[in-house]
Amino acid sequence: MAAPLIRSRSNAVVRRFRALKERSGGDLALLEGTKLVEEALAAGATVTEVAASPRAGRMPRGRALLEALDKRHVPVSLMHEDVLASVSEAETSQGVVALARRPVFAEETMLARDPLLLVAVGIQNPGNLGALLRAAEAAGATGAYLAEGCADPFSWKALRGSMGSAFRLPHLRRVGARETLKRLDARGVVTVAATSSGEMQYDQVDLTRPVALVLGNEGAGLDPELLAAASARVAIPMRGGVESLNVAVAAGVLLFEAARQRRR
């Protein structure tokens, strides 16, 4: 028997989804769209509940996802398009939203072998943070530390930017930046800070060792104490009148330089 179509925004299921939309944090994340739900499932995330419009079930990809969820015994509620739009963060609902448990990662997993780490400080823009995590995973990073002032990696915009990397790339949130650098130094990890005033160019430092790349936001960058605490400070040379790069772009440059050196 088909599930009844939810038409009221006061329905208990709708209120449950809306509560997470309006209050980020906690143990659950709100996922939007077929692709992101697929990525979460593939990463082994626990999807606890799904809401979908009838339109999603008529599309081949949406139908396949709903069948996969049914096999996993994940509760699926059908919602009228207007009702589903009320729990969606997107301007245009993609027809599927889900609740999933946020993964919990262990630091030892990040440090287990040949660490290539990222330390992000004050990355407030969720889209930039998501893109940064995506670049880190693509370059083969073993983990990331998200220090003071960073956006929630499981907010809608961050998840859209990372496209599932937040579920796969081990990371720790709300860590102290200075304490993290000290702890990494004690573990034999070289910390390399990105700054326009770096004493060497990014491709002149040895990134084949256990290393953590430290980046701040585009506006403020890293504070002097953090820069002083790092093992090395590197700059990305730029031409023309360009003074800085988007932090995810800068991270990508450094991460893929590390990947290049490690392939030699």
Please state what every model-predicted region is.
Residues 98, 135-139, 153-166, 224-264:
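Structured adenosyl-cofactor binding patch, chiefly the S-adenosyl-L-methionine
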Residues 33, 124-132, 243-250:
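Amphipathic alpha-helical repeat scaffolds
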Residues 64-89, 172:
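A glycine-rich helix N-cap at a beta->alpha junction
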